[in-house]
Amino acid sequence: YMNRLIYHKGESLIRTREDYVILINILREEICLKRDKILIFRTWGMDGFHVSASFYLDVTNKIEPHKKLFFSIKHTADDFLRTALFNPTIGIGMHKQIVEFQSQRETEGKGAHPNYIAKSVLTGFTEAPAKLASFIKQRRIAGMFIWSRGGGWAGPHIENELWCSLNTFVMSQFIAHQGFKTEEEIFEDFCDKIGLKDDLSVSNFTKLSLLSEESILYGQYSNEYRINNWWTRDHCLGGIDQLKSTFDEIIANNKVEIAICEKERAVENWKEIVRLSNEIESKNETISDYIKISSLYGFYKYAIIKEGFSIMLLGYLGEVTRNYQTQKIISSIDSYDRLWDEFRLLKENNLNCPSLYHPFSF
């Protein structure tokens, strides 16, 4: 990240596993032994230390444990991405570990719309069933770092932290109670915290939150094919440059209809989320209003994605096969333009609406 320091060059001094051992042992001696301070060494990087169990053990087994030495590890075997597998370095080795969790993912709206991921990080996603909760209950990790905000470089910029707070509250309370308080109990505590008025509101807020997790899987990622996870990030909706390899795979495996159906399923889910949001009342009118506005925001975002994705995929399919589905493409273009107009009106008419996405990448 040296883009603002044009005359500087960033480079790591760590090139081998043994380099890690030398560095960590120096830090351990200077910080833990000589000064009796806490040392938290973050494993995040692209060389394997963060995601390879053999790499991790090869380094850490050569370092003597210390009560004030911790290793910090993301819960994903990659960046904080929905389709990333559970990190295999968690719960292994001799050293105490801190697990990192992100409440505001830059690839998934940054809190601009519902995105409840804490439950599935704890109990397992449909496509990635490993469960962090079991490690917490067995006290195999020493604690958690929660990125309550942050992630990414730009927008959307939010006017209310509700959805970031939900993920942060559930995860922090679960680790604080060492798993002896269930996710469901903690979720109900959050409903009380935001002043939901009645059982119907609590029930609808629960359904809405759980549905958001599935909706983002189908709207942004896929359960059927590999996709460039970074085709959207921050407030940018990427295009054919980011999705060409994905489209090649979809076409080669005859999954065009499946791919479009996933996006349609996501939009139907968001329609249900909007319906549920209109039947949720909080004693705090700002909260009630934001639930409605942010749910509409999510609907427009993923409806736009569905149409844009369809236009690009069907257009690319036409280039490959020389057989264009012209009427479907025209219909999606008309819907795409209309949805963008309505999305902009949502922002113009609501002061608490997050800043909008842009129809292009960085």
Predicted features, each with a name:
Residues 1-14:
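Active-site groove signature of glycoside hydrolases
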Residues 14-362:
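Substrate-binding groove of N-acetylhexosamine-processing glycoside hydrolases
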